[in-house]
Each structure stands twice: as C-alpha cells, then as structure tokens.
Design a protein with these regions (language model features):
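Tandem repeat scaffolds
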Residues: 2-211
Length: 211
C-alpha cells in the first residue's frame, strides 16, 4: 500500500479563515477552517491547498469545480453534499460523515477515508486511484462504471453496496463485510475473499444452500 499523505499541514503555520467568506474562483492556501456550520452553501471554482477542515458542518451543499490538494478533513459532516466535477489529491477524511454524498465523475487520487461514515455514497463514473477505506462504512454505496486502481478496503462495511461495470479484480475484500453486495460475476472475478464470504456470492451462480 503506497498512498501518499497530505503534505505540509502543520497547524501552527495555518491561518484561521471562515468558509462563509470564501469568494468564487478564490484560491485558498495554508488555511485552517474550524467549528463552522455552513449548510446549503454553494462553492464554485475554488482551489484549497494545504488546508485543514476541523469540525465543519456543511450538509446539503453544492461544491462545484473545486480542487482539494493536500487537505485534511477531521470530524466534519458533509452529509448529502453534491461534489460536482471536483478533484481530491492527497487528502484524508478522518472520523467524518460523507453519507449520501454525490462524487459522480469526480477524481480522487491518494485519498484515505478513516473511521468515516460513507453510507449511500455515489462514486459512479468517478476516477479513483490509490484509495484507502479503513474502518469505514460504505453500506448501500454505489459504484457504476467507476474507474478504480489500487483500492484498499480494510475492515470496511460494504453491505448492500452496488457495483456495476466496475471490476474488483485483485482487490482484497477478505476482512470487510459484503453481505448483500450487488455485483455481477464478471465484476467480482479475481477479487480476494475468504471462505465465509463465498457463501454470500453463491447467488451469482444460481445455487441455493440447503439448511
């Protein structure tokens, strides 16, 4: 596993700012955003670099054409926010809520989700590379035609997650929960699972287990 972490996010070097004061197309560098509630906000064509977001509540927002680079999100709530044409490069979500977020057609590169609630997340047609989901819940998440490379699930909850035209070849699912996962035989081919998980996938070959 070789996922690059956010670079140079030393809190003593960051200046405190408020999200509510951000202007369209503004570039924000080396800033700390903390203890702010800004639900239903719209952000457009901004670039965040070397920033920290701590205890930010930004639910039901529209975040469009934004680039987050070398940025850390800690204890933030972005539930039901739509990220439209956004890029996340060397970012980390730690103990956050991104449940119901729409990341359709976004680009995620070297991003870690740690102890994060990502239930109902939509990563359809996104490009995700070098991604870690650790101790993270992705229940009923949606991956349709998602371009994936070097994805790691470490104790992830993938119950009832849906994968469509998204290959999991060579991806290790063995220590994650996959009960009720919706996937085709073609997409699951080559994935790494344990013996017990194999039972959850027998429906793909049309057999039933006699009790």
């Amino acid at each position: 596993m070789n996922i690059l972490k956010p670079q140079n996010n030393h809190i003593e070097k960051l200046k405190n700012e408020n999200i509510i004061n951000i202007q369209e197309t503004e570039k924000i560098t080396c800033c700390n955003f903390e203890n702010e509630e800004c639900n239903n906000i719209n952000l457009y064509e901004n670039e965040f670099e070397h920033c920290n977001f701590n205890n930010i509540c930004m639910q039901n927002a529209l975040v469009e054409k934004i680039t987050f680079r070398d940025t850390i999100f800690k204890q933030c709530n972005f539930s039901n926010t739509e990220f439209r044409e956004c890029s996340f490069i060397r970012c980390e979500f730690n103990n956050c809520k991104v449940s119901g977020c729409d990341f359709t057609e976004n680009r995620l590169y070297n991003v870690s989700f740690i102890e994060t609630n990502a239930n109902y997340i939509n990563l359809s047609m996104a490009s995700i590379e070098n991604i870690l989901f650790k101790d993270t819940s992705l229940e009923e998440s949606y991956f349709q035609e998602t371009k994936i490379k070097n994805i790691y699930f470490n104790n992830a909850n993938l119950r009832q997650a849906q994968f469509f035209k998204t290959s999991l070849k060579n991806i290790d699912l063995s220590n994650s929960q996959i009960e009720g996962i919706a996937i085709s035989l073609e997409d699951i081919k080559g994935a790494i699972i344990d013996q017990i998980q194999a039972i959850d996938l027998l429906y793909l070959i049309g057999v039933k287990i006699k009790q």
